[in-house]
Amino acid sequence: MSDINEIEIPSRKDEIRQVTPKDPMHEIEDKSTYHAKIKKSDSGTVLGAIPLNSRSSSNSSVTSTGQSSRRVTKKTTKKKKKNACYFDTCSSAASKFIGDCNFCKGHFCSKHRLMENHACNGLTSCKEQLHQRNADKLEAEQTKAPKIQI
């Protein structure tokens, strides 16, 4: 072979191989999962499924190494400040000592610290507990001796 552009063509079909490597991400654009072989140290090969979302390509980064391909999706969630009031429209700071709600586990400012003011989910169960406690207290205070008739 003296010319660089000449390529030797094998005579049998079994010897024909594809020379150019395929991009695994390009092949699976329309599939919902991609099975990647991940080799662990001396323990064998593990087959794992990695879900892909072809629509979220603008918010994700793709890294591929050797035998495994991974797709990492960044989640953009809105985090509240640690000491801000948990009420939706309030932006004031939560009270440190009196702002904790035991029923919904929220931290509220002095305006929204009461269960009625922040529309607590545990308001009905709290009312039932207080009603039962008052009934038990009244029953314990009642006199048990029969009344004397004159």
Curated annotation (Swiss-Prot):
* Annotated Zn(2+) 1 binding sites: C85, C90, C109, H112
Q: Which SUPFAM superfamilies match?
A: AN1-like Zinc finger (SSF118310)
User: Which cellular components does GO assign to this protein?
Assistant: cytoplasm; nucleus
Listed A to Z, the keywords are: Acetylation, Metal-binding, Nucleus, Phosphoprotein, Stress response, Zinc, Zinc-finger
Which Gene3D superfamilies has this protein been placed in?
Answer: AN1-like Zinc finger
In what ranges is there compositional bias, type Low complexity? Answer: 53-70
UniProt-listed PROSITE patterns: ZF_AN1
Q: Where is the composition biased (Basic and acidic residues)?
A: 23-33
Give any single GO term for biological process: cellular response to arsenic-containing substance
Modified positions (Phosphoserine) in chain numbering: S43, S54
Query: In which domain of life is the source organism classified?
Result: Eukaryota
Residue ranges annotated as zinc fingers (AN1-type) are 79-128
Q: Which InterPro entries match?
A: AN1-like_Znf (IPR035896), Znf_AN1 (IPR000058)
- List of residues binding Zn(2+) 2: C101, C104, H118, C120
Record bears the keyword Iron: no
Q: Where is this region: Disordered?
A: 1-82
Main localization (coarse): nucleus
Where does this polypeptide localize?
A: Nucleus
Q: What else is known?
A: Present with 9520 molecules/cell in log phase SD medium.
- Entry function: May have a role in protecting cells from metalloid-induced proteotoxicity.
Stated name of the protein: AN1-type zinc finger protein TMC1
Q: Which organism is it from?
A: Saccharomyces cerevisiae (strain ATCC 204508 / S288c)
